[in-house]
């Protein structure tokens, strides 16, 4: 949670890309973002490189992205860990929907591209740990626009307490209302469909670290008014309110990959 204290952080589900993959039912999240009339599906990969192999791994992912684009897939959106959780890379693979992503022709092209580049063998040598999640999120065009303008990211990942998913989603929206009132960037909200345990994760996109920390300059009276308008008792109560609904919460600061 990025609230007014600004604690600036210093600190398998493997998907087979073959035509034989059984396509899961196409369902919409119960708490889809209001701006997402047709929920957009992403495959989200959290990856930790083998020791000393991060730059090599980034190069292989760049090659894979180029090959997949030729096969008809959308280019991924990604970032590199700076401080926080243990993953090195977060990669958002645009899918759209299960049905379109796993169309036999498209899946076949993807498989041929992987085989031609011997990608599976390379990834086995370069990856120490990987976690995959399928999640519904914002329209791809909105995300690309934000990533094109930003180079610094704040990622928050949550596992909700039993029965508290709806309240957690609402809290994420409340924080966006708070941020909007202070003229700060709002978070993109993603909702789990299947895969890793994270129920919700959000990505805040900023120009740089200085932009991320600018909220500390907001006047106390403006913070107070924004918090109450969003439904919080006070700015200092945003964190305690969030903790009512979560079992686990990971924060990460990340930077763009050029």
Kindly give the residue locations of the regions a language model identified.
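Bacterial N-terminal signal peptides
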Residues: 7-20
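Short S/T/G/P-rich N-terminal loop/turn motif that feeds into the first structured element of a domain
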Residues: 22-258
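N-terminal secretory signal peptides that target proteins for export/translocation
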Residues: 1-6
């Amino acid at each position: 949670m990025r609230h007014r204290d600004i604690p600036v952080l210093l600190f398998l589900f493997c998907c087979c890309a073959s035509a034989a993959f059984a396509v899961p039912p196409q369902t919409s999240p119960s708490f889809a973002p209001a701006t997402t009339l047709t929920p957009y599906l992403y495959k989200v990969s959290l990856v930790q490189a083998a020791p000393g192999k991060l730059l090599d791994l980034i190069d292989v992912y760049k090659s894979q992205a180029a090959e997949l684009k030729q096969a008809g897939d959308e280019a991924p959106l990604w970032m590199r860990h700076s401080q926080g959780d243990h993953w090195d890379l977060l990669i958002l693979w645009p899918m759209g929907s299960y049905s379109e992503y796993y169309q036999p022709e498209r899946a076949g092209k993807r498989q041929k591209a992987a085989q031609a580049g011997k990608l599976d063998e390379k990834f086995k040598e370069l990856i120490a740990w990987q976690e995959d999640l399928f999640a519904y999120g914002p329209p791809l065009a909105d995300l690309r626009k934000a990533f094109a303008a930003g180079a610094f990211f704040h990622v928050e990942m949550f596992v909700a307490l039993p029965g508290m998913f709806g309240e957690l989603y609402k809290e994420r929206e409340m924080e966006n209302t708070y941020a909007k009132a202070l003229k700060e960037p709002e978070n993109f909200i993603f909702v789990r469909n299947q895969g890793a345990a994270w129920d919700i994760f959000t990505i805040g996109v900023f120009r740089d670290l200085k932009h991320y920390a600018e909220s500390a300059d907001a006047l106390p009276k403006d913070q107070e008014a924004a918090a109450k308008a969003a439904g919080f008792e006070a700015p200092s109560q945003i964190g305690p309110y969030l903790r009512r609904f979560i079992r686990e919460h990971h924060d990460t600061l990340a930077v763009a990959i050029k």
